[in-house]
Every structure is written in C-alpha cells, then in structure tokens.
C-alpha cells in the first residue's frame, strides 16, 4: 500500500468536506434569517393588536407594553444570533420586506417602526425589576452576565463554529494517529515476515585453548613414535631360528587339534541297555507265581482227564457226600459232574512232581499277576534309570571321558541263580551315586578349564623376536 495515494485521498476528502461545510453554513444562515423574520412578524402583530385594544391607556404604559415584547424579541434572537448583526440592522433589513409582503398594512408597519425607533427613549432598568423575576433567575443561572448593549454587540462565535473547529482539530489528530498506526503496523508486518534462524555454535567455542594444545601435542607424539617404530622395524634383521619356531608352533597346534578330535571320538558316552533281571519279580512274589504257574499248567490236564475218565460208582458218590448236609430232593435229571473243590484237591497232588525251569516268556507273563506294591517299586527304579540317562545326555560334552561305573551297578552282571533276587537300590546308595557323579563332573570341569588356560597362555605368549623388539623399544 502506497502512502502517497493515502495522502492524496485524504486531501481530496478534506477538500470535499470543506465545500460541504461552506454550503451548510450558507444554508444555515439563510434558515436563520428566515427564522428571525418570522419571529419579528409575530411580535409586531401581537403589539399592534394590543395597541388597538387599549384606547384609553396612558402613553407611558403603552410605551412600556410595546417595549416589553420588543425586548423579548431581542432576547429570543440573541442566543441564535451570536456573532451576527445587531437588532436594529436586522429590523431595518426586515421592514422593507414586510412592506413588500403586506402593502395593505402600511400604516400599522409605520407605527410599529416608530415604536421601535423610540423604544430606548426614557429607558430604565428599574421599570423591569417588578416584572422580570423569571428573567432575573435565568440570568443567575448563566455562567457570565451579559452587559446590555443596545446598539453594539460583542462578537461571540457560534457553537456550531466552535464544534466544527473542534472537529477539525480532532480530524487532524486522528489523521496523524492513523498514519502512525499504519506505519507501525507495516513495520510489525515486516518484522513478522522475517525468519530468524540462528546458526549452530561452532565447536571451537566449546573447546578451550589448553585442550587444543594438549591434543595437538599428543598427536605429534604419536606420529613421532610411529615413525621411530617403523624405522626400527626396517633396520631389524630376522633371526635364523624364526622359521624353526614357526614350524614348532604349527606342530604344536596340529597335536592339539588331533588330541581334541580323538577325545571327541572316544569320549562319547553310550548308555547300555537295562539288564533283564531288573524286570524280574521280587523273591516274595516267587511262591505266588509258582502257584499260579502250576495251576495254569495243571488245569487243562485235569479237565482232559476228567472228561476221559469213567463215571465213579454210587459208593464213591456216597463217600463224597456230607452226611450233615440236608438231603436234596431228587429230580428227574441229576448233575453228573464232580465237586470242583474236592476234585481239584484230589488231582492236584499227583501232578506236583512236574517241576521244571521257567522260560523268560512265561516269567514275563507271570509278572502280569504281581502285586501292586512290587510294581510300584519297579516303576520307581525304571524312572530313576531314565532320569539318570537324561541328565547324562544333557551334561555330556564332546571329548569327555565316560562316566565311572558305579559300584552299585555293573555293565556285566554275574548270572544269579533263579532262587535269589537282585538287590534293590536304597536311598543311601542313590545319594552315594549322585555324590560320585557330582565329583566326576567337577573334576572334568576343572580339567577342561586348565586346558583352556594353557591354550590361552600359549596363544598370548610372544615369540622370541617380538620380545627382542620390545626390549629394543624400551631401551
């Protein structure tokens, strides 16, 4: 936005405002003149009527009555005619117009003019004291008393002119304020449009001078040390036994590798199968098993024998009957079978001499008829064996030596006779075996740790020429 355009537009606005003000003042003056003429005509007509009615009144009273409205006319016209022409001039200017307007009433107008001209003759303020109580109170209310000047008037500016002057001053001040506000707003807009982007703080500011010097000196020292080391290495002659030391190191490493491979191959643990005697029943179960086994072998033979044997005589039947038992009624059809208890007891004894060794399959079949307490013990034993195998499988590492055989268990158990049962593992034997296993694991762990430490020492040990160079650098 250009300020010159604003300035020209403001000038044009004020110029038009002044033109309008001049036109307004002209119209207001015309209106004021017309208003005064109207007021004068009304006052003159009222005085003429009063003079016609009072025929026998005295001349002094008529003069006072006529002068009183004239004064009222002046009093009415004074507040509106501040700064204008005097009352006499206005009346002189207005009378010719009245004569033109009312030619039939020329005598009345002449009489009124004479009254106006002789109005100030024998004038005294005391004559109006008794009549003008209201005007006196109104004068007291005024801020400043006005002196009675019949012919000379003090020019006082109109309120409208004062108001216009104040408006002009306010407009000028408002214009200056508007210009300053516009300038300030433009400056603020220009400042707001600017984008401040601060540059990062340079790194040299954060580092003090002393640290820079120390860093530079350290770099120079390192460069000098590297230069001296390169010169010494260039001037160093290799010894004759360097190749021999390298060969020894290669042979040593090869031996270690072969040793580790052999240990990995030989030390792999392989669990042996559980011996069959563990699954055999206990010694307390053997009589029961033998009895069941004998019954199972004898029953078919007894049945075959009973079926093929002839029927016994009546005397034999009477022998087996209990005399104390009540007599049973004889029916048409009799049972032709023997009592089970007596027959079995009778025929069981001759076949007891058939005793022979039991095969493993029959032994396993008889194990199905064992007592629940023995089966629980056997299940616990098998669970312990499986747990030991799982622990060994978890803790086993390639290259370890096999676990030492426990005294309680042997890989090749001696054949025991059929009559004796294997010893059952107790809590103390289990604790002993666990302690042995723990000690073996600890010893193997220590052994492998020692081997690793030796390897680290061998790898970290410098060669002879390296030690010589270190001695040279230190010297």
From Swiss-Prot:
Subcellular location: Cytoplasm, Cytoskeleton, Cilium basal body; Cell projection, Cilium; Cytoplasm, Cytoskeleton, Microtubule organizing center, Centrosome, Centriole
Highest rank taxon of the organism: Eukaryota
Compositional bias (Basic residues): 327-337, 398-407
GO cellular component: centriole; ciliary basal body; cytoplasm; photoreceptor cell cilium; photoreceptor connecting cilium; photoreceptor inner segment
Organ and tissue specificity: Expressed in the retina.
Pfam families: FAM161A_B
Broad class of the protein's primary localization: cytoplasm
Alphabetically ordered keywords of this record: Cell projection, Cilium, Cilium biogenesis/degradation, Coiled coil, Cytoplasm, Cytoskeleton, Isopeptide bond, Ubl conjugation
Region (Required for interaction with CFAP418): 255-434
GO biological process, alphabetically ordered: cilium assembly; cilium organization
Covalent cross-link site, Glycyl lysine isopeptide (Lys-Gly) (interchain with G-Cter in SUMO2): 377
Biased composition regions of type Basic and acidic residues, renumbered to the chain: 430-441
Low complexity biased stretches: 54-64, 82-93
Coiled-coil residue spans: 162-234
Annotated spans, Disordered: 53-107, 314-337, 389-441
Family assignment from sequence similarity: Belongs to the FAM161 family.
Subunit structure: Interacts (via central region) with CFAP418 (via N-terminus); the interaction is direct. Interacts (via C-terminus) with microtubules. Interacts with LCA5. Interacts with CEP290. Interacts with SDCCAG8. Interacts with FAM161B. Interacts with POC1B. Interacts with CEP78. Forms a microtubule-associated complex with POC5, CETN2 and POC1B. Interacts with CCDC15.
Role played: Involved in ciliogenesis.
Name used for this protein in its record: Protein FAM161A
Organism: Mus musculus
């Amino acid at each position: 936005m250009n300020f010159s355009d604003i300035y020209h537009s403001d000038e044009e606005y004020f110029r038009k405002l002044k033109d309008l003000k001049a036109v307004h003042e002209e119209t207001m003056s015309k209106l004021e003149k017309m208003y005064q003429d109207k007021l004068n005509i009304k006052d003159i007509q009222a005085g003429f009527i009063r003079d016609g009615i009072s025929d026998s009144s005295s001349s002094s009273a008529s003069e006072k009555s006529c002068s009183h409205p004239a004064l009222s006319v002046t009093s009415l016209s004074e507040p509106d005619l501040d700064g204008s022409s005097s009352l006499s001039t206005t009346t002189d200017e207005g009378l010719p117009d009245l004569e033109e307007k009312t030619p039939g009433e020329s005598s009345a107008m002449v009489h009124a003019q004479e009254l106006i001209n002789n109005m100030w003759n024998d004038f005294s303020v005391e004559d109006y004291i008794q009549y003008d109580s209201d005007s006196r109170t109104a004068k007291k209310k005024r801020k400043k008393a006005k002196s009675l000047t019949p012919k000379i008037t003090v020019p006082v500016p109109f309120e409208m002119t004062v108001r216009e002057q104040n408006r002009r001053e306010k407009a000028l001040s408002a214009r200056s304020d508007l210009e300053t506000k516009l300038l300030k707003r433009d400056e603020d807009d220009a400042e707001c449009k600017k984008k401040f982007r601060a540059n990062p703080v340079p790194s040299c500011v954060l580092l003090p001078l002393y640290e820079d010097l120390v860093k530079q000196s350290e770099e120079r020292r390192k460069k000098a040390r590297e230069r001296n080391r390169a010169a010494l290495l260039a001037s160093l002659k290799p010894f004759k036994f360097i190749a021999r030391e390298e060969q020894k190191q290669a042979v040593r490493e090869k031996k270690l590798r072969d040793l580790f491979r052999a240990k990995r191959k030989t030390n792999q643990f392989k669990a042996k199968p559980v011996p069959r005697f563990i699954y055999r029943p206990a010694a307390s179960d053997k009589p029961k098993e033998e009895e069941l086994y004998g019954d199972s072998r004898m029953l078919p033979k007894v049945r075959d024998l009973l079926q093929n044997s002839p029927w016994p005589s009546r005397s034999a039947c009477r022998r087996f009957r209990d005399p104390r038992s009540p007599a049973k009624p004889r029916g048409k059809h009799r049972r032709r079978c023997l009592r089970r208890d007596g027959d079995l007891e009778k025929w069981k004894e001759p076949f007891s001499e058939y005793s022979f060794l039991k095969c493993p399959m029959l032994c396993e079949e008889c194990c199905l008829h064992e007592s629940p307490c023995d089966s629980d013990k056997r299940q616990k034993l098998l669970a312990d064996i499986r747990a030991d195998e799982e622990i060994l499988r978890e803790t086993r590492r390639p290259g370890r030596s096999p676990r030492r055989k426990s005294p309680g268990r042997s890989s090749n158990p001696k054949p025991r006779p059929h009559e004796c049962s294997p010893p059952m593992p107790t809590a103390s034997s289990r604790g002993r075996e666990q302690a042995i296993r723990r000690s073996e694991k600890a010893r193997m762990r220590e052994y492998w740790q020692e081997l690793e430490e030796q390897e680290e020492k061998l790898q970290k040990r410098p060669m002879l020429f390296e030690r010589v160079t270190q001695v040279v650098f230190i010297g």
